[in-house]
A protein has these predicted regions:
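Primarily recognizes the serine-hydrolase "nucleophile elbow" in alpha/beta-hydrolase
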Residues: 149-209
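C-terminal catalytic histidine-bearing segment of alpha/beta-hydrolase fold enzymes
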Residues: 238-285
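Generic structural signal for well-ordered alpha-helices
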Residues: 148-152, 234, 277
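Serine-hydrolase catalytic machinery in alpha/beta-hydrolase-like enzymes
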Residues: 11-12, 20-38, 43, 51-156, ...
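Short beta-to-alpha linker loops that shape the active-site pocket of alpha/beta-hydrolase fold enzymes
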Residues: 118-122, 199, 252
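Short beta-strand/loop motif that positions the catalytic acidic residue
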Residues: 210, 216-218, 222
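N-terminal export signals
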Residues: 1-10
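Short alpha-helix in the alpha/beta-hydrolase fold that links the catalytic acid
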Residues: 102, 226-236
Length: 285
């Protein structure tokens, strides 16, 4: 468990060269993987990807390291040639190219990734339509929960996946859905849950359903996810003895890790991604 922290710029774990590189990139970039730079150890990892039908009419983006690639990772099950897996959940714009790029970036760390589709193939850049799509799911959450649970079942059935090492990760609307999956995973418990500025549940009794570590990434200027709500969330996790890492970044708002957002903050995005990878390595391998 960790106390609520507010990482400052001078605590960011960026190398000098990375800082210079980040500062030279303009706001016109639409792909966060251009900005999140790994230390190079897995830059040569080759990936395989395909579109898969994992739930009713829903098709997701499956990506994983090719068998010929050498991934530097602490995978506990590498002796039987299986990898940990992550269900990646899109924001309110749908399963777009940015989410697929993030899935690729995560796969290079040694994970099998299934980026799900909760919008029946629809991708939008229109905020009004995005709000309609997400509100439809909030009004009738059962379908989305069934979709996400099927994603876990699908991953666990793959021969290259360790079914005991599956996590979920989502941003914004996807962060909320990552938490909802955690609260509805009785049949197949997860190994970790990652939430980037998603709507929270703060009732201790409800959160008691979670029996694995939780990582939360938030901004203190986020009007839709206020800091007070984050504090209550952390307190409820602690009350249940749920291992957690909660980070609230100073001076940034909602969707700060999305390069198409007006709130985009590249340095905080880099630091949050490093924390995400460290968290997943610790609890997935």
């Amino acid at each position: 468990m960790s106390s609520l922290t507010f990482p400052l710029h001078n605590f960011l774990s960026l190398a000098e060269g990375q800082q210079q590189q980040l500062s030279s990139i303009t706001g016109s970039s639409k792909n966060v993987t251009d900005l999140i730079k790994s230390n190079g150890k897995n830059s040569s990892v080759q990936l395989e990807n395909k579109t898969v039908n994992y739930f009713e009419k829903a098709s997701g983006y499956l990506v994983y390291p090719s068998s010929a690639s050498s991934v530097e990772t602490n995978i506990t099950s590498k002796s039987n040639n299986t990898l940990p897996a992550v269900v990646v959940i899109h924001e309110n714009k749908g399963l777009n190219e940015n989410i697929k790029s993030m899935a690729n970036l995560l796969a290079k760390e040694g994970y099998v990734i299934l980026a799900v589709d909760l919008f029946n193939g629809e991708v939008t850049t229109d905020q009004k339509r995005a709000s309609e799509l997400t509100q439809a799911i909030r009004d009738n959450p059962a379908g989305a929960i069934a979709n996400l649970k099927s994603a876990v079942t699908y991953l666990s059935s793959l021969p290259n996946v360790n079914p005991d090492k599956i996590a979920s990760l989502g941003w914004c609307f996807g962060g909320q859905q990552s938490l909802q999956l955690a609260l509805n995973s009785e049949e197949h418990p997860l190994s970790a849950t990652v939430i980037y500025y998603g709507r929270l549940v703060t009732e201790p009794e409800t959160l008691s359903k979670i029996h694995w570590p939780v990582l939360g990434i938030f901004g203190d200027q986020d009007k839709s996810i206020p800091v007070e709500s984050v504090k209550k969330f952390e307190e409820a996790l602690n009350a249940n003895g749920i291992t957690n890492e909660i980070y609230v970044y100073k001076g940034v708002g909602h969707a700060f890790a999305n390069p198409s957002s007006d709130n985009y903050a590249p340095e905080e995005t880099q630091d949050a991604w490093e924390k995400t990878i460290s968290f997943l390595k610790k609890y997935l391998g």
